[in-house]
């Protein structure tokens, strides 16, 4: 295939990954006909959080990023100067909207279908057949290439080994952080937050402004980086007694008078719309019982290209990364793979890419590896150039962990001050 060949590309999802793919392909392969399928009525993916219709959405009212805007920006598209160093969810959505208007909206080669759900994707002869459904009809369309950009924040990951937990969920005493919106429900209540990732730390801290007591339950309490004085770090939960409102920890300690348990325990990868044979190859046997979801992915070259059919790819599957610039870098790789300018390895251990969580600092190695792949082939005039991870950005990334710890200390002090004033939580004044 050459850059002048007319081909059809489907992008499933209108969040950061889908938008980045549309920008990169429309610039690099202008003869491609691109169709974007967006389940929501607007772009943004998880960052689209209409406050009047927030039920079922991942975001919460007072959320800010855990990565600075200096790292998050797309190639050649900086944030506005007045945006805080750690942008709010609203700042991010406005940034994505501006990105969409600048690079995607009103482009002749790009069609976007809002409020349209992809219900089935299957290989039919030499093309991919997509079945999609909007409010009026069901449609089938054929494409040469497909990029799955549906994200991985739809199926909550919850523990299955805590005795008695089902009754807590049945009585709305336990829920996943996906359903957290703000702290008001916890006023003068005793709450356990399970997990100390970014969301777990942030939610626990926000709760201290109104809750009577906040516990943070994690595997290794001694390693907890939460600096909030109003949060007590405890061991993992062994069992939960709804009748007595008590929780027994793995060290034998019993916590009494518990009102709520919030699980900030992450999400499964889930692709229920992909035909079963392909889904099995990508998700493995799964862990949730419905074969639609899994904690790991398989048979993906460089965490994105389906090795058994390189006309199918997945964008932004890795976690603990800098997603916006990575999405454009991955899309630039996909361009070359789809054009057959960049060969992929199709014979390797299918479990080799099972985990997509990068340990601290390892994401930089991944960016460098992808950039090296791009540099290994001739780049054509007009091709998209993604963010290059130079020394400045590498230093910013390496310092981002301690920078965020310092930010968390400030947020904890802010929450303590609000509690003394008996004021509800809100984000502190922006620092740009």
Swiss-Prot record:
EC number(s) given by UniProt: 1.14.13.-
A Pfam family the protein falls into: FMO-like
Binding site for FAD: 13-17, 46-47, 117-118
InterPro entries linked: FAD/NAD-bd_sf, Flavin_mOase, Flavin_mOase-like, FMO-like
CC cofactor: FAD
Keyword Oxidoreductase among record annotations: yes
GO cellular component: cytosol; endoplasmic reticulum membrane
One of the record's GO molecular function terms: N,N-dimethylaniline monooxygenase activity
Domain of life: Eukaryota
Keyword field contains Manganese: no
Keywords carried by this UniProt record: FAD, Flavoprotein, Monooxygenase, NADP, Oxidoreductase
Positions that bind NADP(+): 65-66, 199-202
UniProt GO BP: protein folding
Family: Belongs to the FMO family.
Quaternary structure, from the entry: Monomer.
Its biological purpose: Flavin-dependent oxidation of thiol-containing compounds. Probably required for the correct folding of disulfide-bonded proteins.
Protein name per its UniProtKB record: Thiol-specific monooxygenase
Name of the coding gene: FMO1
């Amino acid at each position: 295939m050459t850059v002048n060949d007319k081909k059809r590309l489907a992008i499933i999802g209108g969040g950061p990954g889908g938008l980045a793919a549309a920008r990169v392909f429309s610039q690099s392969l202008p003869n491609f006909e691109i169709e974007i399928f967006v389940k929501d009525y607007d772009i943004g993916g998880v960052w689209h959080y209409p406050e009047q219709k927030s039920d079922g959405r991942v975001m919460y009212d007072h959320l800010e990023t855990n990565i600075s805007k200096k790292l998050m920006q797309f190639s050649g598209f900086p944030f506005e100067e007045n945006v805080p160093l750690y942008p709010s969810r609203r700042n991010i959505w406005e940034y994505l909207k501006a990105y969409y208007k600048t690079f995607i909206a009103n482009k002749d080669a790009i069609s976007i279908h809002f409020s349209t759900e992809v219900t089935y994707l299957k290989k039919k002869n030499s093309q991919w057949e997509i079945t999609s459904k909007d409010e009026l009809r069901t449609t089938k369309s054929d494409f040469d290439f497909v990029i799955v950009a549906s994200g991985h924040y739809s199926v909550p990951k919850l523990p299955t080994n805590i005795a008695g937990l089902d009754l807590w969920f049945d009585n709305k005493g336990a829920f996943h952080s996906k359903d957290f919106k703000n702290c008001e429900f916890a006023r003068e209540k005793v709450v356990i937050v399970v997990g100390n990732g970014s969301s777990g730390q942030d939610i626990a801290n926000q709760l201290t402004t109104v809750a009577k007591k906040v516990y943070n339950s994690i595997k290794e309490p001694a390693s907890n980086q939460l600096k909030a004085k109003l949060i007590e770090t405890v061991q993992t939960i062994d069992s939960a007694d709804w009748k007595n409102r008590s929780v027994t920890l793995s060290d034998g300690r019993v916590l009494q008078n518990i009102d709520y348990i919030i699980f900030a325990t992450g999400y499964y990868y889930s692709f229920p719309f992909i035909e079963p044979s392909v889904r099995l190859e990508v998700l493995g046997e799964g862990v949730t019982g419905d074969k639609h979801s899994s904690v790991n992915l398989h048979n993906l070259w460089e965490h994105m290209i389906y090795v058994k059919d390189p006309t199918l790819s997945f964008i932004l599957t890795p976690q603990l990364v800098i997603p916006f610039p990575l999405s454009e870098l991955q899309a630039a790789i996909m361009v070359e793979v789809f054009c057959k300018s960049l060969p992929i390895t199709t014979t390797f251990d299918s479990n080799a890419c099972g985990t997509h969580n990068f340990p601290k600092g390892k994401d930089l190695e991944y960016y460098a590896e992808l950039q090296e792949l791009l540099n290994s082939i001739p780049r054509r005039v007009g091709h998209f150039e993604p963010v290059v991870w130079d020394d400045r950005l590498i230093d910013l990334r390496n310092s981002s962990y301690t920078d965020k710890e310092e930010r968390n200390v400030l947020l904890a002090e802010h929450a303590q001050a609000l509690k003394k004033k008996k004021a509800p939580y809100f984000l502190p004044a922006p620092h740009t």
